[in-house]
């Protein structure tokens, strides 16, 4: 069975929405996050919630991905691209979808679904940001990564004691490459 290049289909659809003025807010979605290895399990005591995640990729090409994610009782379709932004900023478009549709889409994904537990740890600053710490299972068992989303690339933030080496921008730590 031939499955058309899903990245090209989504890119064409997004371009069409922009042309007809339906995607004004879509093009303004920018994600700026920093990613780190985690050196201890001390973060677990600080977590305010955790959730199980399974995700797969319909498309993984240099600079762009299309991801399906089931997170608890919710599901999302996400398009990410570094081709429209500079530095560590990425274009991100996310849409909540029906979980039963997501389960079907996961069957169409490329091999190597990611299964992980995500812990949410609030920061102690006035900006009320949060750390997302992912503990990977399955073929990436033992890998633990922490991410924080920022408003600008040079925005300062407090580094928790359990934070290790920064791996932002290192392709081997992109979920799409695992």
Describe the predicted segments one by one.
Residues 4, 18, 29-32:
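Short, basic/polar N-terminal leader/transit segment immediately after the initiator methionine
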């Amino acid at each position: 069975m031939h499955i058309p290049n899903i990245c090209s289909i989504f890119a064409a659809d997004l371009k069409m929405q922009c042309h007809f003025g339906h995607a004004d807010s879509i093009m303004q979605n920018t994600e700026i996050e920093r990613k780190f290895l985690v050196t201890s399990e001390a973060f677990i005591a600080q977590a305010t919630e955790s959730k199980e995640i399974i995700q797969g990729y319909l498309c993984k090409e240099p600079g762009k991905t299309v991801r399906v994610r089931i997170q608890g009782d919710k599901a999302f379709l996400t398009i990410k691209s570094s081709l429209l932004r500079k530095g560590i900023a990425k274009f991100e478009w996310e849409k909540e979808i029906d979980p039963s549709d997501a389960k079907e889409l996961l069957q169409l994904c490329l091999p190597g679904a990611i299964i992980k537990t995500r812990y949410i740890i609030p920061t102690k600053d006035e900006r009320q940001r949060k750390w997302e710490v992912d503990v990977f299972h399955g073929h990436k068992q033992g890998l633990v990564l922490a991410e924080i989303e920022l408003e600008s690339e040079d925005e300062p933030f407090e580094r928790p004691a359990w934070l290790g080496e920064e791996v932002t921008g290192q392709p081997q730590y992109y979920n799409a490459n695992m």
